[in-house]
């Protein structure tokens, strides 16, 4: 697993985790400046931090109170390392508490937007207005600053909203600069990274590739690596990166379960197998999957069948390869968000992180996860740096069960063909309209509804196709995309005229929540 300690040749700022829901945003903001950042446990010791040699440390926010018996704290030697520290919300309170100040429950809790007033010539607020909007989320506040600090910011309900000790380069803010609602939050974080910590912004995908290739070669040696290739962005980027690092020591298994989008299997083989030279074993399992799904209409049962069948197929092929070629490593497209969402001791688990496809735990492979320090947008940037085509790098998110959950009810080959053809038209027209980078996800779905229509001089009784298109930042919430009417009309006309057995198109204008993005 790549971690911040491995990145010895780049500047880095570490974030110590105290459980804030915004932790991921802090690391993202710092990386946007070209400075590598990673979230580490608050239990990380001063000695471990000394070995990492960061340019700066950020204490995150968190839900606890510093005066609670079981409150999260840190190794006090961290304050003696001579490394600049920025405390955010709980982080500012913890620094104050540790260094001799006082923290107490607030008479009026602050949640949401507040007006911050800057006092004097504060380092982190250079070049920003004396009054600015910030995002507060706290129930406690600093009532007495620690020795060596001065108050540099205040708000109506938080008299001590920002502090600094310029000599030791310790800073604290009661608000959340990482949240977009703090209008000059990015400026503050940039001042900390560049002016206080002295970073130059040397983090890039180019040097990530160099470091990761070297690390993979050292880890793998002359052994063989197996990768489950789905055709999605993450596994494709992993494949190309591994190919660059170890060449023909990599073998990819691509399971075509018959539930892929139009032309997807061919594109994977032509692009990844052709241009990039990946050694891909394609397993044609269409009949196997469709026979297992025959007569099944319950969505959860469909998901379970597809997931289990994928495991069986992959396991069969992996076992063969392990015996024949002595495969030692299994590569996965795990992202940094997967690692974070697995939960830590400071936060509730959002979702369990499993290996790809729920592969059997008794498979005797050592894991390689070269993307597990990267966010999704960084993975796309990495793919571009590796020379991968936009058609793969900017591919739409696609669920593991594939079109199996975009055909509502029982799955048949005829229904799958309707979804494939209509979805291909939708993607073509969205791209032609220049909307493919603006809409977060878009696809067609077959609800299983048939209705009366008229085509030519005859009556029809054919299927309805639904179009789902949403805008989102992180997928947790989403709004339906405002696609121009003329584009929707063109899509509708083409689908009805070009896709057999379709006579009606509907557009889903439901947000998430209450609906989910997928229909099943």
UniProtKB/Swiss-Prot annotation:
Domain Glutamine amidotransferase type-1 intervals: 12-202
InterPro entries on file: Class_I_gatase-like, GATASE, GMP_synth_C, GMP_synth_GATase, GMP_synthase, GMPS_ATP_PPase_dom, NAD/GMP_synthase, Rossmann-like_a/b/a_fold
Keywords attached to this entry: ATP-binding, Glutamine amidotransferase, GMP biosynthesis, Ligase, Nucleotide-binding, Purine biosynthesis
Subunit structure: Homodimer.
Pfam family, one: GATase
Documented EC number(s): 6.3.5.2
Nucleotide-binding in keyword set: yes
Taxonomic superkingdom: Bacteria
Name of protein: GMP synthase [glutamine-hydrolyzing]
Gene3D superfamilies per UniProt: 3.30.300.10, 3.40.50.880, HUPs
Annotated disulfide bonds: none
């Amino acid at each position: 697993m790549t971690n911040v300690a491995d990145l010895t040749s780049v500047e880095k700022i570490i974030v110590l985790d105290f459980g804030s829901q915004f932790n991921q945003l802090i690391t993202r903001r710092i990386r946007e400046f070209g400075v590598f950042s990673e979230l580490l446990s608050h239990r990380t010791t001063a000695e471990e931090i000394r070995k990492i040699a960061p340019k700066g440390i950020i204490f995150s926010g968190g839900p606890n109170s510093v005066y609670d018996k079981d409150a999260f704290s840190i190794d006090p030697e961290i304050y003696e390392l001579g490394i600049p520290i920025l405390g955010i919300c709980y982080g500012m309170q913890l620094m104050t508490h540790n260094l001799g100040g006082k923290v107490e429950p607030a008479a009026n809790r602050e949640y949401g937007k507040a007006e911050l007033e800057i006092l004097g010539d504060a380092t982190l607020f250079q070049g920003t207005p004396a009054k600015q909007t910030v995002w507060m989320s706290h129930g406690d506040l600093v009532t007495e600053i620690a020795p060596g600090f001065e108050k540099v910011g205040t708000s109506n309900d938080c008299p001590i909203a920002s502090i600094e000790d310029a000599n030791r380069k310790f800073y604290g803010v009661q608000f959340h600069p990482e949240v977009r609602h703090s209008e000059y939050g990015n400026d503050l974080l940039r001042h900390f990274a560049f002016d206080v910590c002295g970073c130059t912004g040397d983090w890039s995908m180019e040097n990530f590739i160099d470091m990761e290739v070297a690390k993979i070669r050292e880890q793998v040696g002359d052994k063989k690596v197996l990768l489950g290739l789905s055709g999605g962005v993450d596994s494709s980027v992993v494949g190309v990166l591994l190919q660059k690092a170890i060449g023909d020591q990599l073998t990819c298994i691509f399971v075509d379960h018959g539930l892929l989008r139009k032309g997807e299997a061919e594109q994977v083989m032509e692009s990844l197998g052709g241009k990039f030279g990946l050694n891909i074993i394609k397993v044609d399992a269409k009949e196997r999957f469709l026979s297992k799904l025959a007569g099944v209409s319950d969505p959860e049962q469909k998901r379970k069948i597809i997931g289990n069948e994928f495991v069986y197929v992959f396991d069969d092929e992996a076992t063969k390869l392990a015996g024949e070629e002595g495969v030692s490593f299994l590569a996965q497209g795990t992202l940094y968000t997967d690692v974070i969402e697995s939960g830590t001791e400071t936060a509730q688990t959002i979702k369990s992180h499993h290996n790809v496809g729920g592969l059997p735990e008794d498979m005797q492979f050592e894991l390689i996860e070269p993307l597990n320090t990267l966010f999704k947008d960084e993975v796309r940037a990495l793919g571009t740096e590796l020379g991968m085509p936009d058609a793969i790098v900017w591919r739409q998110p696609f669920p593991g069960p594939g079109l199996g959950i975009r055909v509502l009810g029982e799955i048949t080959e005829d229904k799958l063909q309707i979804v494939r053809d209509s979805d291909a038209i939708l993607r073509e027209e969205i791209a032609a309209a220049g909307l493919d980078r603006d809409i977060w996800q878009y696809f067609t779905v077959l609800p299983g509804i048939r209705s009366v229509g008229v085509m030519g001089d005859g009556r029809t009784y054919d299927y309805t196709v639904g179009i789902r298109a949403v805008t989102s930042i992180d997928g947790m919430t989403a709004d339906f995309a405002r696609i121009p009417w003329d584009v929707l009309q063109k899509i509708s006309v083409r689908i009805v005229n070009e896709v057999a057995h379709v006579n009606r198109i509907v557009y889903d204008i439901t947000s998430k929540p209450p609906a989910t993005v997928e229909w099943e």
